[in-house]
């Protein structure tokens, strides 16, 4: 390697979004503003890390084939603490990227961390990467065909995501500066452990460059409405004329269900409106305050003027969940979790609520509950679902097709059962995303604390053996629900870290796994129909129904194995000095899966319902040497949010003697 390199210092400058956020913080809290300024590169680096990791694994612009590992001592002029560095060539741009490697993991994942450096191959000048858009610029030089409206938008997304990453981590540094306990202890001792766990996930999606995307919100709105800032939100109650709505409910009719969910609400509304107001002509909808201010009074003004949509004065006190548009009451309140439409660009999509979500949620709940009740295979596993009990969306049959869909999706409400109605008092409920979180003043993630607690309770000799037992218990519950559903019934739950709630016992082990949110699942329509469940009553625009067995398998595998278990196992392995621990934990997951498939074969013989060839086909795909990996950055640049792109990666579940 040519060591005649010149390091060039650069002046750090705020971009427009960072400047606006900084000015907001100066007015709001000068200490926070100073921390924001100090952490600006750290926030940007976290987004750069996601971009580089994904482009490498996806082999975007040959970032993987044109990369190699080098020793950090070959770049002694740089202050790099890791032993190895990932070097990625951009031959057309004549640039070389250097990314410090912190670990290598399953599914061909190389973990890296900032600061990152770029070398000009002509001048041999090295500079620190100041923003992820510098990397995007080189990607587009290598692949000019990707320079289009989608990449222009992605560039803005990276600016927004990096700004909000710094916004979030600087708030955490400010608000938790007097804490030092492990994060799990803080969550466990909170008045509402579940809500606190949602608020503890500061950095968002661990792999997506748009992890902190909040396009459509200014700094004040981001502060008011994002989970990490812990702010109470007053949800708006809207009365919508029944001729402008479509509803669905799990058991009783929509109005009765809503009255049961909010027993005091009707009385409060009756006190607000005149005695001769006819409530029977209207239905209750909950609307996010941002959606009310920015969308309802512009796109639905005609209906408001005609008193077909009426805003009530009464509000509901809720808090944002990690997903932004899912709102949660604070314990001891037992009112439902609510999923709402928001025209805000979050991660990779604008998060309105599709008609099929509010319509199909209760229908899907009914089918799943019937399966779980009647099929004995599920009784062996400590897992279940969270009911979606009722949904409503705006619908004006006079609107033309695309306009009708747009307006329907902008006003929708889905009610989900409150987790505290389902769990015993002595367990701690958490969103699994929080299991891998940390904060600046204690880097022990909750999953590590739980394993240490289990090690102590079970009097086990070492962390590694405790971790293996912990992973076995956890994966058995998670996979014991997901795998039989996709294999026997063709239902692929999207059981990633954010779409689950896990409860933990005092000894640190999982008690029960709860899977929620049926918007993104996929159903092999023919398979579910063959098992005796009709889909004729599903919404006519349903995207969840498919004829593609590959799409169904990938949905279940990516969300459950790659995302959910993959992140947990990676985090555990980083807490150990045993370089073989990660591999051994994947062996355990494979054993759990083998056992589930064995049980499926037995249940098939008893009920004579599932062709054994189907089980073998799924096993062959799941245990193949290479497995599909979803290319989140490639999809974003190609503007294919709903058409997934995959690349083959090494599969940790593969064994030579399958």
Name each model-derived stretch.
Residues 2-476, 505-658:
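Nucleotide/phosphate-binding site architecture used for ATP/NTP-dependent chemistry
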Residues 470-506, 513-514:
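Conserved catalytic-core segments centered on acid/base and nucleophilic motifs
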């Amino acid at each position: 390697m040519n060591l005649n390199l010149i390091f060039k210092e650069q002046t750090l400058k705020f971009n427009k979004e960072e400047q606006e956020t900084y000015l907001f913080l100066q007015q709001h809290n000068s200490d926070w503003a100073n921390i924001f300024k100090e952490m600006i590169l750290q926030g940007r680096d976290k987004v750069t890390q996601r971009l580089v990791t994904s482009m490498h694994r996806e082999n975007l612009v040959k970032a993987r084939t044109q990369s190699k590992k080098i020793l950090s001592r070959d770049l002694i002029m740089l202050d790099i603490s890791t032993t190895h560095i990932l070097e990625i060539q951009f031959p057309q741009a004549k640039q070389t990227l250097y990314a410090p490697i912190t670990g290598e993991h399953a599914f061909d994942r190389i973990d890296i961390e900032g600061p990152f450096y770029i070398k000009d191959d002509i001048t041999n000048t090295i500079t620190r990467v100041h923003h992820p858009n510098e990397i995007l610029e080189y990607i587009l030089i290598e692949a000019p065909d990707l320079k289009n409206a989608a990449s222009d938008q992605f560039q803005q997304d990276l600016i927004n995501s990096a700004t909000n990453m710094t916004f979030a981590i600087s708030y955490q540094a400010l608000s938790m500066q007097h804490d030092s306990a492990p994060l799990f202890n803080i969550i466990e001792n909170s008045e509402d452990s579940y809500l606190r766990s949602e608020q503890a996930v500061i950095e968002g999606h661990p792999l997506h460059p748009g992890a902190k995307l909040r396009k459509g919100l200014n700094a004040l709105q981001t502060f008011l409405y994002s989970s990490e800032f812990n702010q109470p939100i007053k949800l708006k109650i809207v009365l919508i004329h029944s001729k402008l709505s479509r509803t669905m409910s799990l058991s009783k009719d929509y109005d009765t269900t809503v009255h049961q969910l909010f027993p005091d609400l009707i009385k409060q509304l009756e006190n607000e409106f005149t005695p001769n107001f006819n409530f029977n002509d209207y239905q209750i909808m909950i609307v996010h305050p941002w959606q009310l201010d920015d969308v309802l009074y512009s796109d639905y003004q005609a209906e408001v003027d005609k008193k077909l949509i009426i805003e009530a004065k009464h509000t509901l006190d809720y808090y944002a969940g990690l997903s932004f548009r899912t709102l949660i009451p604070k314990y001891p309140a037992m009112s439902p979790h609510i999923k709402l439409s928001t025209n805000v660009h979050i991660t990779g999509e604008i998060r309105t609520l599709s008609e099929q979500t509010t319509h199909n949620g209760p229908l899907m709940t009914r089918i799943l509950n019937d399966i779980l009740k009647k099929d004995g295979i599920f009784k062996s596993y400590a897992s279940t679902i969270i009911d979606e009990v009722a949904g409503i969306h705006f619908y004006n049959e006079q609107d033309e097709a695309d306009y009708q869909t747009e307006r329907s999706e902008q006003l929708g409400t889905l009610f989900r059962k409150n987790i505290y109605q389902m769990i015993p008092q002595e367990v701690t409920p958490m969103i699994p995303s929080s299991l891998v979180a940390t904060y600046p003043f204690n880097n022990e993630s909750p999953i590590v604390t739980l394993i240490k607690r289990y090690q102590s309770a079970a009097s086990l000799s070492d962390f590694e053996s405790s971790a293996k037992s912990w992973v076995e218990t956890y994966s058995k519950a998670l996979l014991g629900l997901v795998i039989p559903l996709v294999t026997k019934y063709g239902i692929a739950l999207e059981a990633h870290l954010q779409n689950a709630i896990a409860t933990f016992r005092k000894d640190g082990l999982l008690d029960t796994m709860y899977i929620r949110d049926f918007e993104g699942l996929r159903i092999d329509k023919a398979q579910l129909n063959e098992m005796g469940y009709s889909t004729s009553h599903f919404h006519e625009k349903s995207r969840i129904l498919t004829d593609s067995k590959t799409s169904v398998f990938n949905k279940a595998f990516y969300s459950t194995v790659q995302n959910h278990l993959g992140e947990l196992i990676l985090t555990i392995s980083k807490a150990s000095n045993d370089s073989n621990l990660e591999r051994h934990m994947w062996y355990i997951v494979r054993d759990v899966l083998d056992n589930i498939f064995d049980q499926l074969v037995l249940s098939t013989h008893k009920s004579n319902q599932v062709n054994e060839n189907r089980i073998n086909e799924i096993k062959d795909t799941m245990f193949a040497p290479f497995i599909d990996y979803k290319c989140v950055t490639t999809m974003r640049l190609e503007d294919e949010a709903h058409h997934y792109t995959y690349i083959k990666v090494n599969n940790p579940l593969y064994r030579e003697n399958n």
